[in-house]
């Protein structure tokens, strides 16, 4: 009985996991950043705050790597007044830096228009908090043009809806029982990898299902996709996509023996064949109905 009473609901466990994860990331940011994340807590999901924390950490690493004033700084030495010491040109340089940079592990990271827009939105929100409260006297992010989005979104969801969708796939089976729970758990890591990849890179569903195991390059965090017309190109991904792919590869994919002719396929169906476009579309719609029942979701084929 005690075990049953201590069992957390899906939402409770998600909140706990994400809160602990955010606390760990905040340890890698300047101490004053905690005030911002505490302030936005009521209006954002934990997953959104985690994404913003990663994005803002990139900004401070950029300053330490590229701005002579902060060349010898450690992350703990930054104070809030350093924000108002920057000029619009510094923010523009950061925006340019985001297109291609190396992370802590020396992996080359690139950002699509969507990724660039999200990171700049995070920085503007961060600055806006301190400026609105008159903690800093100027906000250079307001004087910089934000990136325009031209690419078509694969799934038309806002940031919080995306967070809810991924959280549901991660923990939605917690309250299920029997065969429903068994099926949910069997496909969870695969589905989470697919959704995170689609949302994190903007590739088409047809490009996603066409991926082979050898198309993934974890050394540079890139995937080789075949575009319409047969042209191939490398699309780079971030830490969240990397983690989701590795979890899937080291669990579900490793434990599945593919049928003959499907040995190289990255994403396998429960029938041990390469997943098709229709199967992924149905999977996306299934989860989206649970999270946004009043919103029609159509993945980008």
Question: Over which residues does each language-model region extend?
Answer:
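Conserved catalytic core of the tyrosine transesterase superfamily
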Residues: 1-301
